[in-house]
Amino acid sequence: MIHKEIWRKILFYSIISIIAVIIIIPFFWMISTSLKERGALMAIPIQWIPDKVSFEAYQKLFKIFPFGRAIFNSMYVAIMTTFITISSAAMAAYVFAKIEFKGREKIFVLYLATLMIPGQVTMIPNFLVLKYMGLLNTFTGVMLPSLINAFATFILRQNMKVIPNDYIEAAVIDGASHFTIFYRVVLPLSKPIIAALGIITFMGTWNSYLWPLIILTSKNKMTLPVGLSLLNGQHGAEYNLLMAGSLISIIPILIVFLFTQKYFEKGLTLGGIKG
């Protein structure tokens, strides 16, 4: 019995190790390629570790394209979108979960029905509306269509519904307004799921490509994914340049995830239990 358990553990950790290596190899290859000189990219045999480490690709990257500006643009759009989206979703979730009014459930169902509409269907109408409002080639135009998130509202509502009404009733007796109850009672109890949704929203916005490509026309306002696509078109054969740009683009995501991993896992667990 003991031997069987040992072999099970060996098999389990062997499989996990193989999967981990398969996942890590592309990332390692990206780093290796970004540190190679152009002449070493097609070397035979393949150089997994460059014979000569070169930062030429990173230096060239910031010379041929306003990469620093693109990073700032992506960071600004991602942070603002995440903050406003989660704030609006949390307030809407509180209304649907804790405030009784006529037709609440029907309105919520209609609200959720928007999840069934593909983004491609609303892309042209959104573009025309933003054009009419004069918001093309602006960060506001990029952010505006995604500031209302029915999925985030649904997850937060499910989380808030299980918060005991006794807390809210006690706050009402003390003379607290709905805003005070929301800010001081409900939000602190919803921190893990808010953190998880915040990370998901940030990552989705940071990696967004098609909508910023349509809305933004100025090079100084382009986000990082759009900048990388232009890099691919102009310097398609310079793989070290492309890998350097791709590596820089994923660093912020890795940093955010590493520092918020425990909140992310806890939030998803709570969301699954309470949903």
Functional labels for PLM-detected ranges:
Residues I2-G275:
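A structural signal for multi-pass alpha-helical bundles of membrane permease subunits
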